[in-house]
């Protein structure tokens, strides 16, 4: 009979098979009440599942992330329970857990409105408040199929027919009269599922295939308690205020239109930000000793077949033809950089060779996934490729890591989560090469004192990689930076250098991106700063305003001085009240407003005010220039006197 070993090493002996819930009760009534599921020998199981052999067991509660994910999954079933009561003809497809919540794809004969979602949310709460038990039954494949055929659940039948072996025993979960199928685990009782909210609905193809029927995807969020739910909803509210699409329109940064889906029309102020960001990256490239190159934006399909992109990536590539040749518009820069490397004989003495490009790339992203600057079809990559020897890998990765943190710190990003993806089952290269490559990446992170977690088997077939995910002020995660080793592409494209023993050697290639897509990074910055860009990035850094016409000439004189000092300045001589002008430029997030009245003209000075409403008093224009230049030159995140 089972001996159960708990996480603290203590053991409990039973003379009969026991469930996870039985073990929780044996430990104490408080734990039994909190028990959502269990981890038995490392595998998540339902609280009702029986254990009939010795095992290590951990009780899962809502304090564990796994517990929160389980209650979110059960909220998806709760959604199914409610929607079948409101609209019995609904056909249920799939309902997985996602970040912060869940969704369910449903086949419904009408398009859900906001009122429908509110009604559905209300019914879900009414059902959850009954605190009913969720009953799990393991049945044969045929029993499961018969149950869903009887309910006319054609999508569940399709899942059984296409994805589940006839030898399996699927888990059926009974929510009163509602039946769902899942691997589980799920909550034992709906008292765990009180803190949720439905958010929105959208279209989604069955199995993600546009040839299949369009279903409706209903999204919801769920949390362990009311406090966590409210905090999340507040973050969403703040995120909506910071939406880069809204701010981009308000500040006249860019627009997008149907004639060019996923392509950005940069307006003057948005393009100013883009060019400033590009200049910053270019400065760092020089500091870290990169060459800057420029490759063609399209190349013959034959080349993309050699690289393997055509075989694995063709659905995401735009193509065109001319004179009986087919060309691919590049989705990435790496093959072009190998072509540049291949020009002229290279020696081991020429390595490492660091090659960077602001490459104009295009990817045929699904139209439904496009989202402002965050998900586009045309974008500029700030990536680079380093050609080096195996012995140089660690030093080069070290340099890449330092560059990543150097650049992110400029924007105030401090929380950066790092993951190291290691060898997948299908890969090229010997185990010795992979051992060394993974060791070099891990050692470089350790040498820089950077904590990281492994992602076993998540590396590309051609090499391991490091991923850098930055967290913004709302703790949202943005995966931007990567350092990826590549043992494949240089050989596929016949790249080589002459080694120390006069032999031809294929170089190791390191793919390195820091910002990723320039467009996306500007979107991230827009939301991070809520449009209050640091002065060095702001499209207009100062605006000079008159109070009456008598100061117009003085305003123009000051504007020219500021412009000559390298400050982006505008003069506002409109016949409007000064309060109106200040409000307008404050809404435009202009860092500094310089006001000129008769007193300022007489003293040869200017009244300085920040966009946050702080009055900095009267200064000479030379002092203003000196202080602004210092703030801009240092790329400070803070304004004067902050």
Curated annotation (Swiss-Prot):
Catalytic activity of the protein: tRNA(Thr) + L-threonine + ATP = L-threonyl-tRNA(Thr) + AMP + diphosphate + H(+)
UniProt keyword Metal-binding, yes or no: yes
Pfam family, one: HGTP_anticodon
Chief localization: cytoplasm
Ranges where the record places region Catalytic: 243-534
Family under the similarity heading: Belongs to the class-II aminoacyl-tRNA synthetase family.
Protein name, entry field: Threonine--tRNA ligase
Gene source species: Edwardsiella ictaluri (strain 93-146)
Gene behind the chain: thrS
């Amino acid at each position: 009979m089972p001996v159960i070993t708990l996480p603290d090493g203590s053991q409990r002996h039973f003379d009969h098979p026991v469930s996870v819930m039985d073990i929780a009760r044996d430990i104490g009534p408080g734990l039994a009440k909190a028990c959502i599921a269990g981890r038995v020998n490392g595998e998540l199981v339902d609280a009702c599942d029986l254990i009939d052999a010795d095992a290590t067991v951990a009780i899962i509660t809502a304090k564990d992330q796994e517990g929160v994910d389980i209650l979110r999954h059960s909220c998806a079933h709760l959604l199914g329970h409610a929607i079948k009561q409101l609209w019995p003809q609904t056909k249920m497809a799939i309902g997985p857990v996602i970040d912060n919540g869940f969704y369910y794809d449903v086949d419904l004969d009408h398009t859900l409105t906001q009122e429908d979602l509110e009604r559905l949310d209300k019914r879900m709460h009414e059902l959850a408040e009954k605190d009913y038990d969720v009953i799990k039954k393991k049945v044969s494949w045929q029993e499961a199929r018969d149950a869903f055929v009887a309910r006319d659940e054609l999508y569940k039948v399709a899942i059984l027919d296409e994805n589940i072996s006839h030898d399996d025993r699927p888990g059926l979960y009974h929510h009163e009269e509602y039946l769902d199928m899942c691997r589980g685990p799920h909550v034992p009782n709906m008292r765990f599922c009180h803190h949720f909210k439905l958010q929105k609905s959208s279209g989604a193809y069955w199995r993600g295939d546009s040839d299949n029927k369009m279903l409706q995807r209903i999204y919801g969020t769920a949390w362990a308690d009311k406090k966590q739910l409210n905090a999340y909803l507040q973050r969403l509210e703040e995120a909506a205020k910071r939406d880069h699409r809204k701010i981009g329109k308000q500040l006249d940064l860019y627009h997008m239109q149907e004639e060019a889906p996923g392509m950005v029309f940069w307006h003057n102020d948005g393009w100013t930000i883009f060019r400033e960001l590009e200049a910053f990256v270019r400065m760092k490239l020089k500091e870290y000793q990169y060459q800057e190159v420029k490759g063609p934006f399209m190349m013959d399909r034959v080349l993309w077949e050699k690289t393997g992109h055509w075989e694995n990536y063709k659905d995401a590539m735009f193509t065109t033809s001319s004179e009986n040749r087919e060309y691919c518009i590049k989705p990435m820069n790496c093959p072009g950089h190998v072509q540049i490397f291949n020009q002229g004989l290279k020696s081991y003495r020429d390595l490492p060779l660091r090659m960077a490009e602001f490459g104009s790339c295009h990817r045929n992203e699904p139209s439904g996934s496009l989202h402002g600057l965050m998900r586009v079809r045309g974008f500029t990559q700030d990536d680079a490729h380093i050609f080096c020897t195996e012995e140089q890998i660690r030093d080069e990765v070290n340099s890449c890591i330092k560059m990543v943190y150097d650049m992110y710190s400029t924007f105030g990003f401090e929380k950066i989560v790092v993951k190291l993806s290691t060898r997948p089952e299908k890969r090229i290269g010997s185990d010795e090469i992979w051992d060394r490559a993974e060791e070099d990446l891990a050692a470089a992170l350790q040498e820089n004192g950077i904590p990281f977690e492994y992602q076993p088997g998540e590396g590309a077939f051609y090499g391991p990689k490091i991923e850098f995910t930055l967290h913004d002020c709302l703790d949202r995660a943005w995966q931007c930076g990567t350092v990826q080793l590549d043992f494949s592409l240089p050989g596929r494209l016949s790249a080589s250098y002459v080694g120390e023993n006069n032999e031809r050697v294929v170089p190791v290639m390191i793919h390195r991106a820091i910002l990723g897509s320039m467009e996306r990074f500007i979107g991230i910055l827009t939301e991070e700063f809520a449009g209050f860009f640091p002065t060095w990035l702001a499209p207009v850094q100062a605006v000079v305003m008159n109070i009456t016409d008598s100061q117009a000439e003085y305003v123009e004189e000051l504007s020219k001085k500021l412009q000559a000092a390298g400050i982006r300045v505008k003069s506002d001589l409109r016949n409007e009240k000064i309060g109106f002008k200040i409000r307008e430029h404050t809404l435009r997030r202009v860092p500094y407003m310089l006001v000129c009245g008769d007193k300022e003209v007489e003293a040869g000075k200017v009244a300085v005010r920040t966009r946050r409403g702080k009055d900095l008093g009267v200064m000479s224009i030379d002092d203003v220039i000196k202080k602004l230049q210092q703030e801009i030159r240092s790329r400070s995140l803070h304004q004067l006197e902050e």
